[in-house]
Amino acid sequence: MTLTDSDKAAIVALWGKIAPQASAIGAEALERLFLSYPQTKTYFSHFDVSHGSADLSNHGGKVVNALGEAAKHIDDLDSALSTLSDLHAYNLRIDPGNFKLLSHTIQVTLAIHFHKEFDAATQAAWDKFLAEVATVLTSKYR
């Protein structure tokens, strides 16, 4: 999937509203992930995954801020996410299917927080963007 100029504009515009709330939005998306897909907790056995935990807030912030970096380098995701791709492929060995699950919970969280801005076109743009990010993150898997 190729992001159009209007897709890119929608992603960057919404990112401006997400950035100040990155940790809270990330924590909420992770909490949704763990509640909806409990099998994903296996990668976080060392985390406190309870509501409001510092672990959820810290890691959620990392996830969402990484998406912000990707949005800033939307035309060169391979380079922007190379280090994260290595980490997920060689060290963490996250099941690639989990990226789709997290993508879904991120979109639900964005829709709840930004219901006016997260219209059908913006949702479609974010869906494509998150799919491209997942493709890059899993590109080094063997």
Swiss-Prot record:
A single MF term (Gene Ontology): peroxidase activity
Keyword Ribonucleoprotein: no
UniProtKB keywords: Heme, Iron, Metal-binding, Oxygen transport, Transport
Record PROSITE patterns: GLOBIN (PS01033)
Residues engaged in binding heme b: 88
Residues binding O2: 59
GO cellular component term, pick one: haptoglobin-hemoglobin complex
Tissue expression per record: Red blood cells.
InterPro entries: Globin, Globin-like_sf, Globin/Proto, Hemoglobin_a-typ, Hemoglobin_oxygen_transport, Hemoglobin_pi
Subunit structure: Heterotetramer of two alpha chains and two beta chains.
Role played: This is a larval (tadpole) alpha-globin.
Family annotation (PANTHER family): HEMOGLOBIN FAMILY MEMBER, HEMOGLOBIN SUBUNIT MU
Protein name (Swiss-Prot/TrEMBL): Hemoglobin subunit alpha-4
Gene designation per UniProt: hba4
